């Protein structure tokens, strides 16, 4: 089986909510010498992007999202130890405060991005899901003067709108200049990031790690 065929199978396993088969495919891919990062970026993340697009278009609903998320979680149990082995040593890239927006409990992409940031040298403080903007601002204030990156996720357009409110609150509390702000999720676009005055977004978790490192330079 070629690498491309493996990646296609991984993609389809996520889209088809194959909870048991996805981690087994990951083991097969690792045994073939495919790096964990490639398994995520070229296979699993492609599947999650399709799932996110289908959800946004109301082609699938929460039960399907949850099952695809379970398949992804099972895959990450196999892959995270491999990512840890290759974790970059040296100075911490900074503190990444990660969270899912208020009103949103979809944490699949959030968990994946958090894992990838940790594997790339960030210290992680994970606030979890359905997080109030007030809570994010409070945490940012506690770490004023440090290298801080706020990483917010929203799968739904309604919860994405709260990102603008967060940016406004950071400005009001005079914290905006002391943190970098990065947002992701199916409805988030470059245009939206520019509109609300944030620093960056990314297409997938692996790209998020690269963009985050660039933003924090």
Swiss-Prot record:
Signal peptide: none annotated. Pfam families: B12-binding (PF02310), B12-binding_2 (PF02607). Residues 93-217 form the B12-binding domain. Keywords: Cobalt, Metal-binding, Methanogenesis, Repeat. One of its GO terms (cellular component) is cytosol. GO terms for molecular function: cobalamin binding; cobalt ion binding; methionine synthase activity. PROSITE patterns: B12_BINDING, B12_BINDING_NTER. InterPro entries: Cbl-bd_cap (IPR003759), Cobalamin-bd (IPR006158), Cobalamin-bd_sf (IPR036724), Corrinoid_p (IPR012741), Met_Synthase/Corrinoid (IPR050554), Meth_synthase_dom (IPR036594). The keyword Repeat applies. The keyword Methyltransferase does not apply. Methylcob(III)alamin binds at residue 106. SMART domains: B12-binding_2. Pathway: One-carbon metabolism; methanogenesis from methylamine. GO terms for biological process: homocysteine metabolic process; methanogenesis; tetrahydrofolate metabolic process. Residues 1-91 form the B12-binding N-terminal domain. Belongs to the methylamine corrinoid protein family. Can form a complex with MtmB. Acts as a methyl group carrier between MtmB and MtbA. This is Monomethylamine corrinoid protein 2. It comes from Methanosarcina barkeri.
């Amino acid at each position: 089986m070629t690498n491309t065929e493996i990646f296609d199978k991984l993609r389809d396993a996520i889209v088809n909510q194959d909870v048991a088969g996805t981690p087994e495919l990951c083991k097969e891919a690792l045994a073939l010498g495919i790096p964990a990062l490639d398994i995520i970026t070229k296979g699993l993340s492609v599947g999650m992007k399709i799932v996110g697009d289908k959800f946004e278009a109301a082609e699938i609903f929460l039960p399907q999202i949850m099952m695809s998320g379970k398949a992804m979680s099972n895959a990450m149990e196999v892959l995270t130890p491999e990512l840890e082995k290759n974790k970059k040593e040296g100075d911490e890239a900074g503190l990444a405060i990660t969270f899912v927006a208020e009103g949103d409990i979809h944490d699949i992409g959030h968990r994946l991005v958090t894992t990838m940031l940790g594997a790339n040298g960030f210290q992680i403080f994970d606030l979890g899901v359905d997080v109030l903007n007030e809570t994010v601002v409070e945490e940012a204030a506690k770490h004023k003067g440090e290298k801080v990156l706020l990483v917010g996720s929203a799968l739904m357009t309604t919860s994405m709108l709260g990102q603008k409110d967060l940016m406004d609150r950071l400005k009001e509390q005079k914290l905006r200049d002391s943190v970098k702000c990065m947002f992701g999720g199916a409805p988030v676009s470059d245009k939206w990031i520019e509109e609300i005055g944030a620093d960056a977004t990314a297409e997938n978790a692996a790209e998020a790690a690269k963009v985050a490192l660039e933003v924090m330079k």
